[in-house]
Amino acid sequence: MALRPGAGASGAAGAGAGPGGAGSFMFPVAGGMRPPQAGLIPMQQQGFPMVSVMQPNMQGMMGMNYSSQMSQGPIAMQAGIPMGPMPAAGVPFLGQPPFLSMRPAGPQYTPDMQKQFAEEQQKRFEQQQKLLEEERKRRQFEEQKQKLRLLSSVKPKTGEKNRDDALEAIKGNLDGFSRDAKMHPTPASHPKKQGPSLEEKLLVSCDVSASGQEHIKLNTPDAGHKAIVPGSSKNCPGLMAHNRGAVDGCVSGPASAEAEKTSDQTLSKEESGVGVFPSQDPAQSRMPPWIYNESLVPDAYKKILETTMTPTGIDTAKLYPILMSSGLPRETLGQIWALANRTTPGRLTKEELYTVLAMVAVTQRGVPAMSPDALSQFPAAPIPTLSGFPMTLPTPVSQPTAMPSGPTGSMPLTLGQPIMGINLVGPVGGAAAPTSSGFMPAYPSNQVGKTEEDDFQDFQDASKSGSIDDSFTDFQEMPASSKTSNSQHGNSAPSLLIPFPGTKASTDKYAVFKGISTDKPSENPASFGESGDKYSAFRELEQTTDSKPLGESFAEFRSTGTDDGFTDFKTADSVSPLEPPTKDTFPSAFASGAAQQTQTQVKTPLNLEDLDMFSSVDCSGEKQVPFSATFSTAKSVSTRPQPAGSAAASAALASTKTSSLADDFGEFNLFGEYSNPASAGEQDDFADFMAFGNSSISSEPKASDKYEALREEVSPSPLSSSTVEGAQHPPAAATKYDVFKQLSLEGAGLAMEEFKENTSSTKSEDDFADFHSSKFSSTSSDKSLGEKAVAFRHAKEDSSSVKSLDLPSIGGSSVGKEDSEDALSVQFDMKLADVGGDLKHVMSDSSLDLPTVSGQHPPAADTEDLSCAAFGSCSSHFTVSTLTSCEWSDRADALQGRKLSPFVLSAGSRSFSATSNLHTKEISFGSSENITMSSLSKGSALASEDALPETAFPAFASFKDMMPQTTEQKEFESGDFQDFTRQDMPTVDRSQETSCPSPASSVASHETPKEGADDFGEFQSEKSKISKFDFLVANSQSKMKSSEEMIKSELATFDLSVQGSHKRSLSLGDKEISRSSPSPALEQPFRDRSNTLSERAALPVIRDKYKDLTGEVEENERYAYEWQRCLGSALDVIKKANDTLNGISSSAVCTEVIQSAQGMEYLLGVVEVYRVTKRVELGIKATAVCSEKLQQLLKDIDKVWNNLIGFMSLATLTPDENSLDFSSCMLRPGIKNAQELACGVCLLNVDSRSRKEETPAEEQPKKAFNSETDSFKLAYGGHQYHASCANFWINCVEPKPPGLLLPDLL
């Protein structure tokens, strides 16, 4: 989906509008986006100071069910968290604005949450209301004066009297808009008509112009307007003005609507009132002197300006990593950007840069940057902390914010909340977190906070008991991955990462955390939170609160994705009160891993039916049936139930472990790791689920299945390690903590899973045993449902794996690691290239592989595992998470893919791949936490992804040595895989193979496709075993890495996140190092690297630091570097598709998959990716940039492509040769303004089409390359992009478009 050009002005925009795709694609290329792309609009709206206005996506949030305004609205509104906009999360950096001012829709949360949230918000709102009221009164007063003046000037004749009355009426409306009245000194002239006409105008035109706004004000209901208009009108104009460039019409429409809405809302909801932040005042432009007065501008600001300034203005590409280094989640940064970026979308002016820096600084201190106007309160410019670190300093603040983190988790989708702008949770839920922070945080924080707190307490005790350091660390790792997510939603871990998570609950939680892990607040808290959750969940297993946060997060996340689904899910949770909290928490939890999971879940929610089933099944086996049915259905109908797919997976899980909804939920929860809380009601189930939860996150039922099966069938295999561990650990699980600790030591993720598994294993063993056994046994026989679920899961896992991988690679460098990301991506890519293109995925897969290797390369496993596992762990397996994530971003596709086991394999695979990337990106944006969070576990892996690459690489290398089959199997994976998978060892191999092929798509494709393709049921189930186990094993291994290492790596990662990332970019050689370093070295290099990186991050002078951060590559090498990453990702996507389809043993199934709607959509996306590679290939030729790696990548892509064409012919999708011929797009010397016409990715003319132009679209409406869609282009940061190039880049390479310049030599 993300790859599809999309229907709006820009494919991206269209995608943005889409629940998942859009967001993913929504890099702030708002310029070309059309209003329809609500997601994009945010970008345009970035300029709006008025969050309210930005709410087009947020309407729901604001309580204005503005959904009508944007189709996204409804989605966005879900759960009060604009899921739709959420996608922006992918590009939260720019597109978050929409959420910026999102107010959580109070009503959307559970009463408890709402209450708490409401109380907090109420105070804030009341204050704002008071301000608004005062302003309104003042305005009214002015208005009255004006009115009197007007009246006095007009002799009140009878006729005039009517007019006066009319005027008065109008004025009443205008009441709050005396200013407007002034603006329209002659309201008398059009007073009569103004009422309706103005209102209409407002609604209709919502002119960006002041007059339009005035009209709006005039027309809007007096009361509403009074309260809201003041802020809103002010904001509106500002917004409009800011937006004007971006999407005048669009913005204005939404803005006006918003204004109205705001007024209504404000009136309707006091909180809403806040929606219109009075601060937005007309004085939007009112900037503190230290922004425009050069003599007062701090040196730090000037240095950053110098670093980023280019002859053409401030280079966003250079600024991005610097901002990312603030440790704020991308979402938050996106909101800040949106608030400040008023002139050119994607580019800041000097003053805007200073504003952004100041807002970042403020946000880091835990004060949400609601609008630039708030800066005027500061006598001197606040100096942001821009280091590689996630800003631990704010943690304390963060903690308060952290709570929102939980909500953030849920909000991650929301992302926008400037409020939470600081939500660390941003990383995953980062985006969400920030949003939540703004509105959700309060209540979620309560919920989450509370729960978290309880959880935390438990955890605290546990931690304090000493497990905190070891266990916690280990656990941390595990949590980092599994709990990290949790913590995110639990909020906190991520929040911690982000200096100002802004989650209050977090704060409490963090307080605990702080006490416990002040030294490593980021990672610890994150893990802690998660751990807390987990433990607590384990402990309380279901503290409702726990559940709640989970639910909350989840719900929120879900809500973001699909309120209904989530709600159902929530219901399913059986802890209805927890539902909302669950929502919140979950998302938070999901923030990182959970976010992805949430996505999956979200997708699930998408499937109302599934969800319903969930709901109905909610508390019992009943669910099973529905799920079974659903799953089967999902499986068959996968397409429809994408969410169902997710849900289906869940359902399958549920059926698999029909133990109960909790289980199901657990599954989802699994994702959240919060599953524990999620199944508050059913401890056993929950335990199951939990066990699953963590383990099964990737393959929930599978986990059990896997475990059981593994236990039964695969105990011997390394994969089984996790399973076995589960089995073995059950004893360990005797004491949750023991298990946890042991597992933690072995692998937090595993521990969690194991533990859960133990807990639930026993239980699960019964429950699952049947299910599992049957499922497992049915792996082959009962594939349909169980397997499917498993397959589903597998796909998810793979996807997850991929995603994790991607995340690390792309999202891996979240926080200030934009470059890091690049570097990461590059490194991953390079690694891939080094490894043979598999490294990247290998990393993620590697973790799978590693598990297979079973500890041979724990560090590698750790890293990769962490990537995978960390994420996987997070969700138990990020796989699920990633899955979810994938689903989330590629919700439709992924969902469908997920739903359709086969599709999961095929479309899903691709989705995953793309989504993965997207998600990764998303995470990336808000990912510093994510990464860090994930990093906790994955952090080391991810965070150390810097280190990771080497670590991973060695691991991989080792892995390779160890499991040569991995690579080999990769080759025959499709064919032999089934066998392999069937055999335990092979399973492992397979996993490894998967790893090998792992490039995002590979992983998903290998694993997923294989399961899907080969034996959906068998393969998947088996595979899931492997996948999961691999993950788990990898996870455990990664955990094995040692908490110490984890922490180190995590801490380093924090640094690494930012600096490491640039270091990564700077030292692409690292991968070589890792590669060269043998597995033994893995740990050392990993460690060293972390240390060096962290030291490096800490030491460099600000100027150098920024230079490092920007990860500047020599210009002549930059093209090769960027294209290498691009082609590497494309190869992954295409290879994943190919492997997926190759993995389907039955040609009938393969044909069915390909010809299904999802299959075709998926393949069209793959075709689109291939077309991007063809464009890039021409760009490479045109610029004469030549490198062996690029040539090899192109060859590999063509090779895989030619293989894939055979499948496409089954669905008449084979692209016309002309559609792949972009020779007419090459920019020849002499073309004026060639520089402006060059696509920032492929350097081809954005206005030219492939030669397929003449082909009428109706001829092959299914083709992605008719001239219509081919013509989509976007503008961002001073560059133009083909929609598909930008879309692909943002989703599969990195969240920030590369902005390549056409070399003058052309």
UniProtKB/Swiss-Prot annotation:
Name of the protein: Synergin gamma
Oligomeric state and partners? Answer: Self-associates. Interacts with GGA1 (via GAE domain). Interacts with GGA2 and GGA3. Interacts with AP1G1 (via GAE domain), a subunit of adapter protein complex AP-1. Interacts with AP1G2 (via GAE domain) a subunit of adapter protein complex AP-1. Component of the aftiphilin/p200/gamma-synergin complex, at least composed of AFTPH/aftiphilin, HEATR5B/p200a and SYNRG/gamma-synergin, which plays a role in the AP1G1/AP-1-mediated trafficking of transferrin from early to recycling endosomes. Within the complex interacts with AFTPH/aftiphilin and HEATR5B/p200a; the interactions are direct.
Write out the coiled-coil annotation as residue ranges.
113-153
List residues, modification Phosphoserine. 471, 576, 715, 744, 764, 804, 844, 847, 901, 911, 927, 974, 998, 1065, 1067, 1079, 1090
Q: What is known of its domains?
A: The DFXDF motifs mediate the interaction with gamma-appendage subunits AP1G1 and AP1G2.
Task: Provide the primary localization.
Answer: cytoplasm
Q: Has UniProt tagged this entry with the keyword Membrane? A: yes
Membrane topology, as annotated: Peripheral membrane protein
Quote the PROSITE patterns the UniProt record gives: EH
* DFXDF motif 3, short sequence motif: residues: 767-771
Disulfide bond positions: none
Biased composition (Polar residues) is annotated at 993-1005
For the region Interaction with AP1G1, AP1G2 and GGA1, what residue ranges are annotated? 661-673
Q: Where is this motif: DFXDF motif 2?
A: 685-689
